[in-house]
Amino acid sequence: LITVFVAALVTAGMAGATAVPLASLVSEHATGLVYAKAGPGGPTRSEADAARWIRDNSKPGDLVATNAHCMIQRGKTCDSRHFWIAALSERPVLVEGWSYTNKANRDSITTGVNPSLLPFWDTQRLATNDAAFTSPSAAVVESLHRYGVRWLFADNRAGEISPNLKQYFRLRYATLDATIYEFR
């Protein structure tokens, strides 16, 4: 009987120790964050279809760039636990969410800041990546090419998408929420 009681006590303690920190990660009151757009943190059906289209029409090592990085955003603070494009496309992404990276977790230990709320450490890469979607130019396209990007996943819910993308990339697939482009 004592063994059962101790086991139950340990289990309850472990559950509580896990739940309390997790609550601070997701509580918008604890972080002051709000959802960037109304809706779930995951993809819409059409976004998921677009990611699967990339999976079905590309090679496993093809690199994807996307403008979607934050599950939740307020001002310059980004909850960077966004990873479903890489997950559903089964392709590497130049910059998507970075919360689950070794670098973010190491930086979290040294700074005491939640890894989900740390800014992306390679500001030049992020700026180049995002410029491809907001203000594409020959220089930006060349930079993406040097990184090895083959595909663009333009998520309409993540922000404005420049109509000039079609000058540099070939439109391959479009849904209500996402458009897929390929390097020409």
Indicate where each model-derived feature is located:
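Extracytoplasmic
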Residues: I2-R184
